[in-house]
């Protein structure tokens, strides 16, 4: 059996200029990065704004195993299948972070015969967007430290700077650092730290900005810290939003690539869903909606994280809301949520599928709360048995949710045809009536309680003393009408990653609240969630290499 990278490298790529002609994009609309990658010009983005808006399909998942459940694979395979049945379709997904690529995932461009290509480029440096975001973020850090060194005219309290440096790697040693050591010429000594690039507010801003002017406005609104009198300091006070926008002027343009089957795909932006809002860029999604009849997009991790944030944070910035939500489930994840140990997930266990179904059922119920029809996609694995599949289909029928087996990893577009037909039928027969979970005018506490009690099904929210102080500060500064972006483990509805399935009557503790004024939301940190991940005992990097001819080895 071929590996993902072997399949990808066996495909004869089409020039990107030919791929995008299918959706009305011409050569002059592109800024090429070689033959197979391009950015879309702002002229074309503005030109298509007058076009009618197509149908939007959001792909999410149940609470995953550490290896993931194939959301990107299903997203890509579904789009290929929609094109196969005659529906003009585009993809809009996130670009991978090098941290997880080198860490546990080894790649994030789909899998098997449902991949975006060239996968090696996408998984590594791609068009340089991650580096531009990293540079803009760290340029701001350098400008803050220079301001302190040059006399601190703004009266910034160096103990209350909340802006951190970033790097696009998993590096736990950088979580807490001290800068400015050595001598007075090296700046003002202070405590600092690094986040992973995809947790940077600049990443979120890039993914929510609608044009260069909106980008500058959002950058100007970033809160970097506080003065000695506790008043906030914004990027606009440093007068550097223009310089930061300049660094990002190309990164904000959506990237175009192709699938194995030649479906045009936007791959742009990559915030994590457990520590950020977990969605690709508004620009890419909005543009795809105006170029194609169907746009398939995804939101990170389970529906409790990515989908909730897509619907409460991203959707209000889009020209339409999702017409259907596809919830990806695997029998191995259902069995894990049903109490089976990780080393026994490939063994048949119908009762564990029944027990784990409570997790999937809750996600279906939650999507319906937003007024959107759900479809379940079973991402097929070779270890699945007929009895397990039949049981899952029976359970889905009991709650009235359509379900289809998808074999896109093994069979490509053909393996997603029944899923595509079911999604199209669902959209036609069950019109969506989108509603947000909460009103932004509610208090910070009320919005968090809504998410915890209605989506997670917890019974109570506890706010640590630090969080209570931060809420008072947020209210004092009139920031309390922003939506909430929960930072929580992806493995459980609760803030305890070991509490699998469908836990109830648990309490969630909010330990910290971070205002992201540029992005336009407040991050609520729970449990032990880290904004700088660490590497596993055996990183995927140990299996990677490059051949003498430059061919990548070991990505998957």
Swiss-Prot record:
Q: Which GO terms describe its molecular function?
A: ATP binding; formate-tetrahydrofolate ligase activity
Going by the UniProt record, its keywords in alphabetical order are: ATP-binding, Ligase, Nucleotide-binding, One-carbon metabolism
* Pathway in which this enzyme or protein is active: One-carbon metabolism; tetrahydrofolate interconversion
Q: Which reaction does it catalyse?
A: (6S)-5,6,7,8-tetrahydrofolate + formate + ATP = (6R)-10-formyltetrahydrofolate + ADP + phosphate
Under Pfam families, the record lists: FTHFS
Gene Ontology biological process terms in this record: tetrahydrofolate interconversion
Q: What is this protein called?
A: Formate--tetrahydrofolate ligase 2
Per the record, the gene is fhs2
């Amino acid at each position: 059996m071929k590996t993902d990278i072997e399949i990808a490298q066996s495909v004869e790529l089409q020039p990107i200029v030919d791929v995008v002609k299918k959706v009305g994009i011409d050569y002059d609309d592109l800024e090429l990065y070689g033959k197979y990658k391009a950015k879309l010009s702002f002229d074309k983005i503005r030109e298509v704004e007058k076009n009618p808006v197509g149908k939007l399909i959001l792909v999410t998942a149940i609470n995953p195993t550490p290896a993931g459940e194939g959301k990107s694979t299903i997203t890509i395979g579904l789009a290929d299948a929609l094109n196969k049945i005659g529906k003009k379709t585009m993809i809009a997904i996130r670009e991978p972070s090098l941290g997880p690529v080198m860490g546990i995932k080894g790649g994030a461009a789909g899998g098997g015969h449902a991949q975006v290509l060239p996968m090696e480029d996408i998984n590594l440096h791609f068009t340089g967007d991650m580096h531009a975001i990293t540079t803009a973020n760290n340029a701001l850090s350098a400008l803050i430290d220079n301001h302190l060194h040059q006399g601190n005219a703004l009266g910034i309290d160096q103990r209350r700077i909340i802006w951190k440096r970033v790097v696009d790697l998993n590096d736990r040693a950088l979580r807490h650092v001290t800068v400015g050591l050595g001598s007075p010429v090296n700046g003002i000594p202070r405590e600092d730290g690094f986040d992973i690039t995809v947790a940077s507010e600049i990443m979120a801003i890039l993914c929510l900005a609608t044009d260069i002017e909106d980008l500058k406005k959002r950058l100007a609104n970033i809160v970097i810290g506080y003065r000695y009198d506790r008043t906030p300091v914004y990027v606009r006070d440093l007068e550097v939003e223009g310089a930061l926008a300049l660094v990002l002027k190309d990164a904000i343009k959506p990237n175009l690539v192709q699938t194995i089957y030649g479906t045009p795909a936007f791959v742009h932006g990559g915030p994590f869903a457990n520590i950020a809002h977990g969605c690709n860029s508004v620009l890419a999604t909005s543009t795809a909606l105006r170029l194609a009849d169907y746009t398939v997009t995804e939101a990170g991790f389970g529906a409790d994280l990515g989908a909730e944030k897509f619907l409460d944070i991203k959707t209000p910035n889009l020209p339409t809301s999702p017409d259907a939500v596809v919830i990806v489930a695997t029998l191995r994840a259902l069995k894990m949520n049903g109490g089976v140990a990780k080393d026994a997930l490939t063994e048949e266990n119908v009762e564990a599928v029944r027990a784990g179904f409570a997790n999937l059922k809750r996600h279906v119920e939650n999507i319906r709360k937003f007024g959107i029809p759900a479809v379940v996609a079973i991402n097929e694995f070779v270890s699945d048995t007929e009895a397990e599949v039949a049981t899952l289909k029976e359970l889905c029928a009991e709650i009235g949710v359509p379900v289809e087996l998808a074999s896109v990893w093994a069979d490509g577009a053909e393996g997603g045809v029944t899923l595509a037909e079911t999604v199209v039928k669902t959209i036609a027969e069950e019109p969506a009536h989108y509603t947000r979970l909460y009103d932004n005018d509610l208090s910070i506490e009320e919005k968090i309680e809504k998410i915890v009690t209605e989506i997670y099904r917890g019974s109570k929210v506890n706010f640590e003393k630090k969080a209570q102080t931060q809420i008072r500060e947020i209210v004092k500064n009139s920031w309390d009408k922003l939506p909430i972006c929960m930072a929580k483990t992806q493995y459980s509805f609760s803030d305890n990653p070991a509490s699998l399935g469908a836990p109830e009557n648990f309490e969630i503790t909010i330990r910290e609240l971070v205002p992201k004024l540029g992005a336009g939301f407040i991050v609520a940190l729970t449990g032990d969630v880290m904004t700088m991940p660490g590497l596993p005992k055996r990183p995927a990097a140990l299996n990677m290499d490059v051949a003498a001819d430059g061919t990548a080895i070991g990505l998957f």
